[in-house]
Amino acid sequence: VRKRTAGTVAVLGATGKTGRYLVARLCERGYDVAAIGRDRARLEALDERARPVVADLEAPATVKAALAGAERVASLAHARHAQALIDALPAGCARVVVTGSTRRFTRLPDPAAEAVRAGEAAFARAGLPGVMLHPSMIYGAPDDRNVNRLLRLVRARRVIPLPDGGRHRVQPVFVDDVVEAYVAALERETAPGPPIVIAGPEPITYAAMVRACAEALDRRVAIVPLPAGALIAAARVARALGIALPFDADEIRRATEDKVFDPGEMRERLGVSPRPFAEGLRLKCARGWC
């Protein structure tokens, strides 16, 4: 029998790349955790201290039942589900944390970014006691997509082609820091208010990320610049001809847009200081996830 010491927290999206670590961290802190997701088998593989609860944001009645009695709610589901979550919240819920994305700041035409902006607007209109977090590129989990792709590339090739030589900047954030940000957003009195960006401490170029991955694997690589415009044109031609490429034109466009953010609110309102990319990558590899 679990001893409830810190209150009840419901976590939606509990089986995702970040959700499963948040569930474990909240259990460590003594919460009675309702881990909510669509797949019972995956839910039952989470921290055994959590209660698996099957629900689907596309089926509002199931979510309302899953959230009944929750004192705090953290949703790691896509921001397009914000209104469904708002409608399902129990009366008297003391804190709500929802997930957006720094993709909402893009200047490129992007339906995914529009969905995040719409979710942010819905959450703001609701006037709930809580906050929306906008994570940047999250890395560090065993199955993180972006960094694992770079690690595979570095293992397979000595010469790495990058759009514009990889000079464009991103600000990846380590998964442990993301989890601590969610915990703080659930607990700290300074958390509620405008959305908070969850990002690494400073921008890093794609080229520097590749070199850090090579160093972590004790490999030497050479980076070859490829004009982004030519890659976009090639992707368009390949698509028209039905040829599958490992990238599409939209991916190249996004890769040439600097993604630079100020993590000041993350530090000030949440008390979380994100670690540099190289440090997070070392931790990922030390855990055997490289």
Locate each region found by the language model.
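Conserved Rossmann-fold cofactor-binding substructure of NAD(P)-dependent oxidoreductases
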Residues: 54-75
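N-terminal Rossmann NAD(P)H-binding glycine-rich loop of SDR-like oxidoreductase domains
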Residues: 9-29
